[in-house]
Amino acid sequence: MLDPTYPLFPTFAFLGFVLALVPLPWHLQAWNSGTCFFMVWTALGCLNQFVNSIVWKDNAINSAPIWCEISIRITMGLSVGLPASSLCIIRRLYHIAKVRAVSHTRAEKMRVIIIDALICVLFPLVYIAMQYIVQGHRFNILENVGCYPAVFNTPVTYVVSYIWPVLIGMVSATYSVLALIEFNRHRLQFSQFLHSNSTLSVSRYLRLMALAMTEMCCTVPLGIFVIVLNCTSTPIEPWVSLKATHYWYSRVDQYPAVVWRSSHLVVVCNELTRWLAPVSAMLFFAYFGFAQEARRNYAAAWAWACRALGLPERIATLPTTKSKGPGFAEKFAAKAKGLSSFNVKDFTSEFSSKAHDFTSKAKQYTLPRPMPQTPSSSGFSSSESTRFGSSVDGKELPSPTTKEFSSPIPIHLSGMQTLVSFDSNKDLPSPPAYDVEAQYGPYNIDNRVSYHIADAGVRASYPMGVAYSSDSEHRRINPHATFTSANNDTDEPTSPALPDTPSSCSSSATFSTLQSRDFIVLPSTTDVTRDTGSLPIRRSPAGPPRLPSLSQLFGISSMRAEGRDVEAQVQDVATGTAAPTTTAPAPASTTIAPATTTATAPTTTANIQRGEPDVPTSPRTHRASV
């Protein structure tokens, strides 16, 4: 009788055998014993089923009795080996969720491996040996399936054979519930604990939990189904003695497919049993075969193979950029069509013509690099809002970034240098980066205090729109304030220098001319001069990042102080005696620009909400060569 699952089943069985062993080397290096035992049992099950489906295709002849003796014992061990491996994984995750120290010394690691080996190896071997008690004869051969254990259906069989996969699954389920409870109870300590462990991350923890729970959801229902099927499909014989059970033990029963496929329940039971190993292998590879550590090892293996064969290493490192699509300049120009006062061509012509496209070789860039020199004749300025303490609009300032965020990668597009940071990519270098600096500039035509951007750089990969320094004074530049071109040759006196303090400046319809959706600006202690020179380098402070509220980035219009003279406010800030003031929306500033710069359209909350899409939440900072 033709096998409806051929050649699909042998193909999946062989793929499962290969894929289950692919992640084994780096899991061995990480001493993940429970996961390694899971891979070994899955690979053995797939190999066993692959051989059986090939050798006994369309026949039930006893052509390989020795292999059948080995095959049925692999099947017996697999029925408890997979649940036992899942139990070890869940047990380890439970101890981690309780924020217990993961073993670090060699003796502690060996102790954990020995315990897992007792559960995943010794217990299945004992289980296999116990099957001799209820084994009625050597084995059965099913056409298109292969060798199958022959178990005598007695009450002892349920205690010795059928009940153990279900019991192990129940214990795993208990550990799963306890692990979830502890995970919810100790979330903060749990996160800090995983960050201190180099071999386990939050992503790997969740994937291990998902794998163990998925396997548990497969084996427990299957074990219950086997028990119900054996209780209802065949009569339960009374237990007499071991000698009576082993009467004519040497025989081999052979069943053509037309016989065993005549019962629908038997077909379902046999197919579920033999598909268990390939499905487990596919699930395991889906959880771990595409993770970051897996891709890194694939790249290393490819490089090793190329060196061994004398071939050029085409893929030596992981790709850090996606396939090239529409450029940023084209997207930006399309978005700027609605701004009648903005000319993309005029704006981009003001930038250096030395820009190049580094998109395809971003990984070759290493910080620090020299800061660009800025002409003193023009710059960008912004309205200043009221002085505030440690919060913005009632929201606590987010903390500075940590080493979890990589150093920026330079990309030159249409004369604009943009720095893009990739979230939590530890492969990238992380030397000190440049801060964004701004100098205190002259008054503009609206008699408002402004900052003159002398130079621009990147401090580090911050969440959107906030920068920090070690000074306790907090000031900010309004998000959505109108940025115009300022002339340094004005005869108006400059205000005193401000301390180097945190400020934030998000993009608006006009500030988008900097091609920056989350620009960072810091007031500088340096006075405005014609030759600004290079800016100093400072290390970024450490601390966990946290995103600001969207209202800080998109919902704030330009503000203007009322009831006090602007110059008096500046003096108060310099002396540290400034008092809180009431702010109100400020009118759009009038452009003071060279002939090449056009007037800037007023920015309102409505325009921003209509014109700008949501900013991605990945931390990014940008750098503009002004």
UniProtKB/Swiss-Prot annotation:
Protein name, as recorded: Pheromone B alpha 3 receptor
CDD domains: 7tmD_STE3
Keywords assigned by UniProt, alphabetized: G-protein coupled receptor, Membrane, Pheromone response, Receptor, Transducer, Transmembrane, Transmembrane helix
Function according to Swiss-Prot or TrEMBL: Receptor for the BAP3 pheromone, a prenylated mating factor.
Membrane topology label: Multi-pass membrane protein
Recorded family membership: Belongs to the G-protein coupled receptor 4 family.
Pfam families: STE3
Residue numbers spanned by region Disordered: 363-409, 481-509, 524-549, 571-626
GO molecular function term, any single one: mating-type alpha-factor pheromone receptor activity
One of the record's GO cellular component terms: plasma membrane
PANTHER family listed in its UniProt record: PHEROMONE A FACTOR RECEPTOR
Compartment annotation: Membrane
Transmembrane stretches, start-end: 8-28, 36-56, 70-90, 113-133, 163-183, 208-228, 271-291
UniProt GO BP: pheromone-dependent signal transduction involved in conjugation with cellular fusion
Keyword Transcription: no
Phylogenetic placement of the source organism: Eukaryota, Fungi, Dikarya, Basidiomycota, Agaricomycotina
Listed Low complexity bias regions: 376-391, 574-606
